[in-house]
C-alpha cells in the first residue's frame, strides 16, 4: 500500500550484535508519507556501526539502501534462506554487506492508539542471523552477527507520540545457524497525548517460537542512574555540525519484571554507550532523538515451568526526551 | 578521614562530615548555617564524646564542648537512623531517642539545620562512604540494627515481584569505581518506575539533583584539562628556552576552578563534559599566559609556592613564554572547529575575545593606579577593576564558554551568568586578597603579604585609606605605597597590615565578601532558574557557595 498522508510512516529497523559484543550494526530504513498530491514519499536511511575499538560510526540520513530490503514483513522468506542486506554511507564508510536469515517467527508486539486518531503497529522478530562484511574508515571486518528486525507502521507525530523504550536480547549460545535458545523483546510506548495511552509488552521466544506474551498490566519497568554523557555520541555527523540542542540523559540501568500466573521474567540491562540519533522532526525544527544504547543484559525467570538464566549483550532504545521538542 | 579505631567517635564523625561538606558541598553547609545563625549548639554522643557547633559568617565551626543555647544528646538508636543509608531521612525520629533541650524556637532551628544537613548530604557518595567507614569501625556507636538483606522472591508469592524492589534492595548497584577523570556521578539517585502496569512516567523526566561533590568534580576536571593542555603544547625545539618553560605554570596546578566552571556549565545545559575540555584547556593557557605577564608587571617573586618564571629565567624569556601561551590558547580555541562545529566555535571565539579584552582593561586600570600611586576612593572602583581584571576570566567567561560548548549561543541565556558570577567573582577576589594577608602560606601558595609589597589596590587598602583620619599616618602609609617593590621592606608590609587591623579593614573585607557572595548566590538561584536541577548545575551551585565557606 503506498503511503498517502503526510504523517503516515513505515519503518524497517535492523539491529545486530556480534556474540562477543565487539561489533554492533543498527540500520533504520524509513518512509514518510508525501507532503501532498504529486509528491513522492520521503525516504531516509541511516546506518550506525559500533566497534569496541573504534567507537561509533554513522552515515548521514541519506545512506544507500537496497530497493527491496530484506524483511520477513514485506515479503516473507523461508526460514534459513538468506537474503542480501547492503547499506552504506554515501562516503563509502560505514557500510555493511550482509546476508540475513530468519530463524524464527515474527509476532506483533503491540498496536497502540494515541493522540487525535494517531496509531502504530509494531511487529518484532528476534533471532535474525547476519553474516558478511562491516566496513569502517580503514578497517574491514568479517562478521557473524545475531540480532533483531522489526517493522513499525502507522500514522503518528510528535509530540503526541512522546517517546518509547524498546529493547531486545538474544541468548547467544548454541550453533550459529540455529535460532537462539531464548530471546526477549520488550516495547513501552510513552505517549504524551494522552498520557493514559501508554502501552507495552514483554515477549519471550524459545527456539524461534513465541512462548509467552506478557501484556501491559503484567510487567513493570524501572530505571536507575544515568549514562555518563561522555558515552553518548550524537549522530549523524551533520547533527554535530549544526549544534543540535542537548537531550535528556539516558538511563544507565533498566530493569523489567514481568509476571503472569506462575510465569515470571526479570531483565536487567546495564548500558555502556549510546548513539543519539537526532531525527529531523516533520512538525517543527527541533530534532527528535532516538538513543541506541548498547549494554550487558541479564535475563532470568521461570516460564512454562522451565527456568531460564543467561547473560548477553543487548540493545535498548530510548526515544524522545529532547526538551525543546516539547515546545512544538 | 580518621585512620585509628579509637578516633571513630560521634564527635569526630560530625567534625569529619562538616569538614567534608565544606570542601565538597559548601551549599549544604551554608544552608544549615543560615538556620543556626546566632545559636550555640552542644552535642553529646553515646560514646561519651561531645562538641560544640556555632556559626561564623556562613561557616559551621566545630569546637570543644562549651556552654550552649541548645543541647542535643544522641543515643545509639538515633545514630543508627541519622544518615542511615537504608532509611528515608524523614523516618529518623524515634521516641526518646534524642534528648534535645533549649528554647523551642532555637530547638526547631537546630532541627531544621540537621534536617538540611542529613537530607542534602545523604546523596553524596563521599559522605555515604564516610559514614559507612565509621559504622564499620565502631558499630557499637550505632547499636546492631543493621537490616538483613531481603530474601529472593518466591514465584508463588503474590507480591515481591516489583521492579523497584530489585533496584533498591535485592540488586542494588555496587559502589561505583569509575576512573577519577569521570565528571559526574558524585551523587546517588533513587531508582524510579517508568511503568507500573497502569501509569507511565516518561524516561526523560529526570530526578532533580540539588547538590554534588565539588571536590571530586574539581579533581576530575583538573585532571582532564591538565592532560589536554599537555597535548596542546608542542613537543619540539626550542625546548629548553620555550616549550619546557611553557609547561611550567600549567604544571603548577591550581584549584581547578575555571575548568570546573567550564565543564559544569556545559553539563548543566545538557552538553557532554568532553566537549568542554578543550575550551577549558584554552582558558587555562590564556590564564597562565596572563599570570606570566602579571608576575612581571607586579614584580612578584613566587607563584604557586615556587619562584616566578621571570625570577627563574629572566624577563625576556618569560615575556616570550607568556606570548606563546596566549598563541597556544588561540590555537586551542580554533581547534574546536573539528569537534564542536562552526557555530559553536564562532561563539567561542567571540566569548574568548571579550574575556581577553576585559582582562587587559582591568590590568590597565590597576597598573595605572599603582603607576600614579593613586588609591581609588570607593569600593565600586575596585569592583569594576576586579571584575574586568579577574572576574571575567575566572568566573563569568568559564560559565559562558561552557554553555557555548553545550550549544547555547543565545546572548539572553548566556547573560544570565553575568551578575551572579560578577558578584561571586568579586567576593572570591576579596577572599584571595585576604588570604594573602592572613592565610596559611602552605595552603595559599603565593608569598604572604606579597600584595602589600607590590602595592596591590585591595578592598582592605582602599578601606584603610578611606578610614585613616590622622594626616601623619596617612602620609606615612602613602609614602610606603609610593615605593617601588624592590625598595619596600617586610617592615613596610607589616606596618600596612597593622594599620589595616587597627582600622578594621580586615573584618570589613570579610563581611563585604560575605555580603557580595550572598547577593551572587541570590542571583544564581533567580537568574539561572532556567537550568533544571542537574548535577552540572549542582556543581555550579557549590562553587557559588565555595566563597562563603572557604576557611580564612
Where are the model-predicted features located?
Chain A
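Structured soluble/peripheral alpha/beta segments that form catalytic or ligand/cofactor-binding pockets
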Residues: 1-328
Amino acid at each position: 500500500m503506498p503511503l498517502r498522508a503526510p504523517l503516515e510512516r513505515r519503518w524497517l529497523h535492523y539491529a545486530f550484535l556480534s556474540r562477543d559484543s565487539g561489533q554492533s550494526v543498527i540500520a533504520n530504513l524509513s518512509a514518510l508519507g508525501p507532503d501532498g498530491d504529486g509528491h513522492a514519499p520521503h525516504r531516509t536511511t541511516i546506518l550506525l556501526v559500533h566497534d569496541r575499538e573504534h567507537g561509533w560510526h554513522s552515515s548521514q540520513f541519506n545512506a544507500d539502501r537496497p530497493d527491496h530490503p530484506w524483511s520477513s514483513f514485506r515479503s516473507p522468506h523461508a526460514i534459513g534462506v538468506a537474503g542480501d542486506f547492503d547499506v552504506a554511507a554515501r562516503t563509502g564508510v560505514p557500510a555493511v554487506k550482509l546476508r540475513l536469515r530468519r530463524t524464527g517467527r515474527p509476532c506483533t508486539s503491540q498496536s497502540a492508539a494515541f493522540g487525535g486518531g494517531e496509531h502504530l503497529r509494531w511487529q518484532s522478530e528476534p533471532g535474525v542471523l547476519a553474516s558478511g562484511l562491516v566496513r569502517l574508515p580503514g578497517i574491514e571486518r568479517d562478521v557473524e552477527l545475531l540480532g533483531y528486525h522489526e517493522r513499525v507502521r502507522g500514522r503518528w507525530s510528535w509530540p503526541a507520540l512522546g517517546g518509547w523504550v524498546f529493547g531486545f536480547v538474544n541468548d547467544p549460545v548454541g550453533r550459529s545457524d540455529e535460532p537462539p535458545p531464548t530471546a526477549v523483546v520488550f516495547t513501552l510506548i510513552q505517549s504524551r497525548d494522552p498520557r493514559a495511552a501508554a502501552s507495552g509488552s514483554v515477549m519471550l521466544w524459545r527456539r524461534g517460537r513465541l512462548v509467552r506474551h506478557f501484556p501491559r498490566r503484567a510487567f513493570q519497568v524501572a530505571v536507575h542512574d544515568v549514562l555518563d554523557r561522555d558515552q553518548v555520541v550524537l549522530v549523524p555527523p551533520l547533527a554535530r555540525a549544526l549544534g543540535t540542542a542537548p537531550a535528556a540523559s539516558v538511563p544507565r540501568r533498566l530493569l523489567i519484571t514481568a509476571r503472569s500466573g506462575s510465569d515470571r521474567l526479570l531483565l536487567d540491562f546495564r548500558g555502556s554507550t549510546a548513539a543519539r540519533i537526532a531525527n529531523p522532526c516533520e512538525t517543527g525544527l527541533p530534532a527528535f532523538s532516538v538513543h541506541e544504547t548498547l549494554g550487558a543484559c541479564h535475563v532470568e525467570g521461570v516460564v512454562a515451568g522451565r527456568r531460564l538464566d543467561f547473560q548477553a549483550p543487548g540493545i535498548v532504545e530510548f526515544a524522545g526526551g529532547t526538551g525543546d521538542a516539547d515546545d512544538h | 578521614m580518621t585512620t585509628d579505631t579509637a578516633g571513630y567517635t560521634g564527635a569526630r564523625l560530625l567534625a569529619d562530615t562538616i569538614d567534608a561538606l565544606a570542601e565538597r558541598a559548601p551549599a549544604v553547609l551554608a544552608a544549615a548555617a543560615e538556620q543556626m545563625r546566632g545559636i550555640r549548639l552542644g552535642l553529646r554522643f553515646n560514646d561519651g564524646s561531645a562538641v560544640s557547633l556555632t556559626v561564623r559568617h556562613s561557616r559551621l565551626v566545630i569546637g570543644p564542648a562549651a556552654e550552649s543555647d541548645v543541647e542535643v544528646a544522641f543515643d545509639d538508636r538515633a545514630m543508627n537512623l541519622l544518615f542511615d543509608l537504608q532509611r528515608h531521612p524523614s523516618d529518623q525520629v524515634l521516641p526518646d531517642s534524642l534528648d534535645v533541650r533549649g528554647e523551642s524556637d532555637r530547638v526547631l532551628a537546630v532541627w531544621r539545620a540537621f534536617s538540611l544537613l542529613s537530607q542534602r548530604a545523604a546523596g553524596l557518595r563521599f559522605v555515604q562512604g564516610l559514614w559507612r567507614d565509621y559504622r564499620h569501625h565502631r558499630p557499637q556507636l550505632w547499636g546492631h540494627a543493621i537490616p538483613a538483606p531481603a530474601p529472593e522472591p518466591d514465584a508463588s508469592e503474590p507480591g515481591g515481584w516489583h521492579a523497584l524492589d530489585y533496584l533498591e534492595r535485592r540488586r542494588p548497584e555496587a559502589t561505583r569505581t569509575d576512573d577519577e577523570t569521570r565528571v559526574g556521578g558524585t551523587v546517588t539517585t533513587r531508582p524510579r518506575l517508568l511503568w507500573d502496569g497502569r501509569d507511565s512516567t516518561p524516561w526523560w523526566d529526570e530526578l532533580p539533583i540539588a547538590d554534588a561533590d565539588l571536590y571530586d568534580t574539581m579533581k576530575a576536571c583538573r585532571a582532564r584539562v591538565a592532560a589536554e593542555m599537555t597535548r596542546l603544547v608542542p613537543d619540539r625545539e626550542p625546548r629548553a628556552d620555550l616549550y619546557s618553560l611553557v609547561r611550567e605554570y600549567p604544571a603548577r596546578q591550581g584549584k581547578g576552578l575555571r575548568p570546573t566552571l567550564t565543564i559544569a556549565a556545559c553539563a548543566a545545559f545538557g552538553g557532554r563534559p568532553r566537549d568542554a575540555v578543550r575550551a577549558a584547556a584554552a582558558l587555562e593557557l590564556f590564564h597562565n599566559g596572563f599570570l606570566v605577564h602579571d608576575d612581571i608587571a607586579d614584580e612578584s617573586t613566587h607563584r604557586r609556592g615556587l619562584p616566578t618564571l621571570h625570577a627563574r629565567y629572566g624577563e625576556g624569556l618569560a615575556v616570550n613564554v607568556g606570548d606563546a601561551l596566549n598563541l597556544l590558547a588561540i590555537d586551542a580555541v580554533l581547534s574546536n572547529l573539528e569537534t564542536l562545529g562552526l557555530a559553536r566555535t564562532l561563539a567561542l571565539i567571540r566569548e574568548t575575545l571579550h574575556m581577553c579584552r576585559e582582562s587587559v582593561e582591568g590590568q590597565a586600570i590597576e597598573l595605572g593606579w599603582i603607576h600614579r600611586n593613586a588609591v581609588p576612593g570607593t569600593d565600586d572602583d575596585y569592583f569594576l577593576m576586579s571584575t574586568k581584571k579577574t572576574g571575567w576570566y575566572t568566573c563569568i567567561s568559564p560559565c559562558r564558554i561552557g554553555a557555548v560548548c553545550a550549544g547555547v549561543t543565545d546572548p539572553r541565556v548566556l547573560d544570565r551568568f553575568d551578575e551572579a558570577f560578577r558578584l561571586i567573582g568579586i567576593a572570591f577576589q576579596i577572599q584571595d586578597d585576604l588570604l594573602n594577608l592572613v592565610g596559611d602560606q602552605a595552603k595559599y601558595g603565593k608569598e604572604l603579604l606579597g600584595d602589600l609589597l607590590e602595592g596591590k589596590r585591595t578592598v582592605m587598602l582602599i578601606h584603610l585609606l578611606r578610614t585613616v583620619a590622622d594626616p601623619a599616618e596617612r602620609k606615612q602609609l602613602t609614602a610606603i605605597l609610593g615605593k617601588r617593590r624592590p625598595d619596600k621592606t617586610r617592615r613596610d608590609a607589616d606596618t600596612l597590615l597593622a594599620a589595616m587591623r587597627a582600622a578594621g579593614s580586615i573584618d570589613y573585607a570579610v563581611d563585604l565578601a560575605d555580603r557580595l557572595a550572598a547577593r551572587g548566590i541570590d542571583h544564581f538561584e533567580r537568574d539561572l532558574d532556567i537550568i533544571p536541577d542537574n548535577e552540572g548545575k549542582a556543581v555550579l551551585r557549590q562553587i557559588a557557595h565555595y566563597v562563603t565557606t572557604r576557611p580564612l
